[in-house]
């Protein structure tokens, strides 16, 4: 396991380096006004002097090396447009907590509703609970998320009794965004748990338990469900982390001051330093989620041996 994790972390670091470096280079192709708050009022000489002071006229390899050197020391530069001269890390630290809180609530809701739904669908395969649950999953996956997000906002705002501007101090303002964010993962958990339970139900140990006269409910809960959860658990950390950093549309829709709205604003205003800092954070979050998923699988099912699997290839 340790050997596998070492290899996985090494590959992840390489992937992180490639992704962020590529984005860094692409941002250097963008117009230079993204580095100046008062670009329209500046002369060409002032622009060139500013670019020289920021090191943006240096050769690209030199810029990349300097960026990574500073990033390893926790310095991602300063914002030039969104909040002039404010450290990128400080802005991220202000915006990330509310996205994390909303992501945690959305994940808990999707697990609390999605896992029981998948369990019931798997236990009653082909019967009305399975058909009803399948119809719900198909609806969620077939309809574009933006469509049901808008419907939830239009009809839910009046029902819950909230305004259009988000108020973090009032719990009612959290209801609609959290419900909207949880729908996709809810359908995902239910669909795959149902599939894994159906697969497990056809295995020999289940037939043996039935032959011994074990109650069908006990088989489903104590054997089939536990084994079906093992592959699903792998995706929970990455799904949660992706929810935290991927709620761009939801946060923009409800005016939530989180990471999603920050990314949209910085892209629209061409704040390149902020964008590359956000991309670095997103890449780190995604990679950490994948590694945590593998670790969680081993903790739940000790029979899994990634080290032996890697050695056998």
How should these model regions be labeled?
Residues 2-11, 117-153:
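Cytoplasmic-entry segments and transmembrane alpha-helices of multi-pass inner-membrane transporters
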Residues 9-12, 16-17, 21, 89-120, ...:
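Transmembrane alpha-helix signature in integral membrane proteins
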Residues 16-66, 156, 161-173:
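Hydrophobic alpha-helical transmembrane segments of membrane transport/permease proteins
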Residues 19, 106-114, 177-188, 260-298:
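Hydrophobic alpha-helical transmembrane segments of polytopic membrane proteins
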Residues 57-115:
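An internal, D/E-rich "acidic patch" concept
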Residues 109, 133-187, 264-266, 272:
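Generic hydrophobic transmembrane alpha-helix motif, especially the helices
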Residues 170-210:
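Membrane-cytosol interface at the C-terminal ends of specific transmembrane alpha-helices
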